[in-house]
Amino acid sequence: MFAKKIRELRNKKGLSQEKLARLANVSFITIVKIESGESKHPTIQTMAGISRALEISLDELIKDIQLRKK
């Protein structure tokens, strides 16, 4: 699940939700909603910002989502 992956990667980096939001240039509420599963379809811009903040490629961030859709 996308929400779980974001939370796990964020925790692994030692980032708070607030810090991740700042680094990704998105609102704190956006991160909260994504991690809680409330926001199931974040924009590509949001996902790109999060991937940059987590220092992983966008492909790596969304690959599990792509695999489940097949």
Go through the PLM ranges and name each one.
Residues 6, 20, 31-34, 61:
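Conserved hydrophobic/aromatic packing and binding residues within compact polymer-binding modules
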